[in-house]
């Protein structure tokens, strides 16, 4: 199965994206939840046999250290707090840097309008799909579901993995199900899967149907269920 997915600009970009979903001050986010989501994302990339850059793995090891320190006795609480504080300061600094970069890019676009030479078009692979949800938003939500499914399948020793699931067949199956039910939760489909390969194939099929506007997606909250609809609301 050949899969290509645009990555974030770096581990801090991914962390900033995760933190921003909470809509609170950076220093008030539940850091353990953010760490879990980051690790779920990295593990899902590995399961899907996608390349993970070294800086992402380095950050993952640092996050696991912060998480493990939380399990230690309170006598080392100051060490834990120092690590978390350092991480949050880096995210905040990156957030300011990104805001400045975006402002400069906007100014550049405005200046380009004064020249007769057409400016070079920028192409963003992480395109907005529907309801302001991007490919990466769905992938991050999927990685959290994937983590839960891996935990279930890990205890099932009778499952035999197969790798002959066809995306086209999965797309047809989802469309057929929507003809009957009109609305389905993506997690409900995953719960019926017997292997991780089947889960991955269904996710990719869903993503393709969404991109083609054959089905429509919604997520009522940043951490809510992903809903597939036959018709747009």
UniProtKB/Swiss-Prot annotation:
Entry keyword set: Cell cycle, Cell division, Chromosome partition, Cytoplasm
GO terms for cellular component: cytoplasm
InterPro entries the record matches: ScpA
Location (main, coarse): cytoplasm
A GO biological process held by the record: DNA replication
A family per Pfam: SMC_ScpA
Subcellular location: Cytoplasm
Keyword Lyase appears in the UniProt entry: no
HAMAP family per UniProt: ScpA (MF_01805)
Family classification: Belongs to the ScpA family.
Job description of the protein: Participates in chromosomal partition during cell division. May act via the formation of a condensin-like complex containing Smc and ScpB that pull DNA away from mid-cell into both cell halves.
Subunit details: Component of a cohesin-like complex composed of ScpA, ScpB and the Smc homodimer, in which ScpA and ScpB bind to the head domain of Smc. The presence of the three proteins is required for the association of the complex with DNA.
Record protein name field: Segregation and condensation protein A
Organism for this UniProt entry: Streptococcus pyogenes serotype M1
